[in-house]
Design a protein with these regions (language model features):
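Extracellular/periplasmic metallocenter environments
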Residues: 28, 114-159
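Residues that flank catalytic or metal-binding motifs in active/ligand-binding sites
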Residues: 47, 73, 85, 116, ...
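Short beta-strand and strand-turn-strand segments in soluble, beta-rich domains
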Residues: 59, 105-114
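Short aromatic-acidic-glycine turn motif
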Residues: 95-106
Length: 159
């Protein structure tokens, strides 16, 4: 009987650790649904668009802040952080970005390196290759708490 208790405890501990490893996988799988299209194919033609991040004098912005693309078009975003702070470029629909912004308020140090999202440090750059397979209006935003609200928001109109 004394041997059963340690074995049961070890089995429960192993199950808890396994469950802890599985939950983040499922959370990440749910994140693999992209509202604004899908990751691009580098073997196919694409247009290059540079988006510069600014945070001058307390104002935060993307330049350009609006982009029009054709459905099916691939865009290679070259994202340049010309500011003094770290910023993000998260491409999604407004609903998904607002939902993700709420998560960022809970976990403000979370960094992104996803097909549709990058964290870019000051004086650095990153790239996203994206295929806009759906019509509609989508947004790119910095979801670091307070940045979206300070103006770090742009629109992609897919026709």
């Amino acid at each position: 009987m004394t041997l059963r208790f340690p074995l049961l405890t070890a089995a429960l501990l192993a199950a808890a650790l396994a469950l802890g490893a599985i939950v983040p996988l499922h959370a990440h799988e749910a994140h693999e649904h992209f509202s604004a299209g899908e990751p691009g194919d580098p073997k196919k033609p694409f247009r290059v668009v540079q988006v510069t991040m600014h945070d001058d004098n307390g104002a935060m912005a993307f330049e350009p802040s609006k982009l029009e693309v054709k459905r099916g078009e691939q865009i290679k975003f070259v994202i340049v952080n010309a500011g003094l702070l770290a910023h993000e470029f998260v491409l999604a629909n407004e609903k998904d970005n607002l939902k993700h912004a709420a998560l960022m308020r809970k976990y403000p140090d979370m960094e992104h390196d996803d097909p549709n999202a990058k964290t870019v440090q000051p004086n650095a750059k990153s790239e996203i290759l994206w295929r806009f397979s759906k019509r509609g209006t989508f947004e790119f935003a910095c979801l670091i708490p307070g940045h979206r609200e300070a103006g770090m928001l742009g629109a992609v109109i897919v026709k």
